[in-house]
C-alpha cells in the first residue's frame, strides 16, 4: 500500500507501512563454477540464489518471482514455504496482494479519462469533487489532478491516523473511503500544493473518488473494464466489499514480528483500508504483463503515456528514483531505467520493473521486511534485469 519514508516504516514493525522505505545493506556476491576440459558445470541461477537468500538469510517466510528475459521468455521462481504451520510448498506464481502497484492501475484509469476529455490534469480537484478537500492548509481548489497522481499535493497520509495504528484489530474491518479521508483531513497539510514531493496514500484515495464521480461507476468496475480485462490479466482483481480471502492458490502472508514473537497470519484481510491506493490482488507474472503493456502503449495514448513518464525527483524512495504519474523510474547498474511501482500490503512486499527493451521482473515476499532486506529485494530486481 504505502511506498513511503523509513521513519514511518519504523513505527510499525508488524504491519504494512511503506514498502518503499528501503535502503541499506549490500547485495549478494554471485559465483560461477569454472568449466573443466571434460564438461562445464551448470551455472547457478542468480535469481534463485537471491530468492533463497531472502528466505535463509533475511528470514522471509516465502519469496516468489517471475522474470522475463532478453529473449522474451518468462521463468517463475519460488523459495521458502507457503504456510509456516504446514510447511506446504509455495504455489508457483501464486496470488499476492500487490499493494501500491494499485496506484499505477488507478493512474491509468484517470489518464484514460484525461484522454477522453472528461478530466483535466491541471484542473483543480474541487472542480470534480467540490468541497471534499478542506482542512488545515488543505483546499481542493488549489490542488490539481496532476498533483494527486504525482504526490505533490501536500495531502497528509491517512495511514497515519490513529484508527490504522495497529493492523491486528482491523483485519476484517470494512472502511468507507470517506472514513479514511477524514483521518487524513484531521492532519495538517504537509506543504503547499506543488511546493515539494511526499508519498501519501491519500492522493490515490482521492483519485479513486474522482474516478467514481466522473464515470458514475464503482472504482473496481472501471479498473476491471479499462485495465484488467483489456489486457487479459486473468489472475488479477480488485476485491469486492467484504471479500477477505484470496481467490486462487497463494502463499500465506504474515505481519512482521519482533524477534521471538510468532508471526501473525494476515493472509486474509479486508482490503478496504487500501482501496484505490493498494487493494489490487495479482501475481508476479500478471504484474510484469501489466507494466509491459503500459510501457508499450497498450493502455494509454502516446500523449498520456508521456505525461505519466514525466517525473520529479523522489529520492526518499531510493538513490536516483523519480516519480511520474503513478509509476516511478529507478536507474539500473547496467544502464537505463526500470519502470514500475512496487507495493506493500499488510503482509506482502513487492518490487519489480520493466525496461524499454522488454525485460521484466517482479519479486514478492510474504512479510513486510526491514530496510536492509528491502534493499536486497531492490538489488535482486536490478540483478535480474541486468544479467
Question: What do these predicted ranges mean?
Answer:
Residues 43, 47, 98, 102, ...:
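Hydrophobic (often cysteine-bearing) scaffold residues that line and stabilize catalytic clefts
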Residues 2-3, 38-78, 262-387:
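Catalytic loop of the DD-peptidase/beta-lactamase superfamily, centered on the K-T-G motif
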Residues 51, 71-72, 103-106, 110, ...:
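Residue-level preference for non-acidic, small/hydrophobic
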Residues 58-61, 86-146, 191-200, 275:
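Short active-site loop at a secondary-structure junction
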Residues 1-40:
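Secretory targeting and sorting signals
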Residues 82-84, 153-154:
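Solvent-exposed coil/turn segments that connect beta secondary-structure elements
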Residues 137-338:
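Short, surface-exposed loop or secondary-structure junction motifs
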Amino acid at each position: 500500500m504505502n511506498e513511503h519514508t523509513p521513519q514511518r516504516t519504523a513505527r510499525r514493525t508488524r504491519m504494512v507501512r511503506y514498502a518503499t522505505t528501503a535502503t541499506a545493506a549490500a547485495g549478494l556476491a554471485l559465483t560461477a563454477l569454472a568449466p573443466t576440459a571434460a564438461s562445464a558445470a551448470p551455472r547457478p541461477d542468480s535469481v534463485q540464489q537471491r530468492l533463497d537468500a531472502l528466505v535463509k538469510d533475511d528470514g522471509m517466510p516465502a519469496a516468489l518471482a517471475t522474470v522475463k528475459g532478453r529473449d522474451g521468455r518468462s521463468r517463475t521462481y519460488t523459495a521458502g514455504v507457503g504456510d509456516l504451520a504446514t510447511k506446504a510448498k509455495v504455489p508457483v506464481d501464486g496470488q499476492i496482494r500487490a499493494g501500491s502497484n494499485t496506484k499505477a492501475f488507478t493512474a491509468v484509469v484517470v489518464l484514460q479519462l484525461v484522454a477522453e476529455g472528461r478530466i483535466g490534469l491541471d484542473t483543480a480537484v474541487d472542480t470534480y469533487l467540490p468541497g471534499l478537500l478542506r482542512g488545515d492548509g488543505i483546499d481542493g481548489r488549489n490542488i490539481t489532478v496532476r498533483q494527486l497522481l504525482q504526490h505533490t499535493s501536500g495531502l497528509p497520509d491517512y495511514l497515519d491516523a490513529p484508527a490504522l495504528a495497529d493492523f491486528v484489530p482491523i483485519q476484517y474491518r470494512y472502511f468507507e473511503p470517506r472514513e479514511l479521508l477524514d483521518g487524513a483531513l484531521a492532519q495538517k497539510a504537509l506543504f503547499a500544493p506543488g511546493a515539494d514531493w511526499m508519498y501519501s496514500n491519500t492522493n490515490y484515495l482521492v483519485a479513486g473518488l474522482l474516478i467514481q464521480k466522473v464515470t458514475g461507476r464503482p472504482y473496481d468496475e472501471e479498473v476491471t473494464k479499462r485495465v484488467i480485462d483489456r489486457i487479459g490479466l486473468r489472475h488479477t482483481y480488485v476485491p469486492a466489499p467484504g471479500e477477505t480471502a484470496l481467490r486462487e492458490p497463494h502463499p500465506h502472508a504474515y505481519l512482521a514480528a519482533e524477534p521471538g514473537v510468532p508471526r501473525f497470519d494476515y493472509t486474509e484481510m479486508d482490503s478496504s483500508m487500501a482501496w484505490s491506493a493498494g487493494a489490487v490482488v495479482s501475481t508476479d507474472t500478471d504484474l510484469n504483463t501489466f507494466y509491459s503493456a503500459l510501457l508499450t502503449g497498450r493502455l494509454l495514448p502516446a500523449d498520456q503515456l508521456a505525461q505519466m513518464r514525466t517525473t520529479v525527483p523522489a529520492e526518499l524512495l531510493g538513490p536516483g528514483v523519480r516519480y511520474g504519474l503513478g509509476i516511478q523510474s529507478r536507474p539500473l547498474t547496467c544502464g537505463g531505467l526500470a519502470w514500475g511501482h512496487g507495493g506493500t500490503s499488510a503482509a506482502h512486499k513487492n518490487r519489480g520493473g520493466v525496461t524499454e527493451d522488454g525485460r521484466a521482473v517482479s519479486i514478492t515476499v510474504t512479510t513486510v521486511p526491514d530496510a536492509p532486506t528491502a534493499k536486497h529485494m531492490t538489488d535482486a530486481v536490478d540483478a535480474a534485469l541486468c544479467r
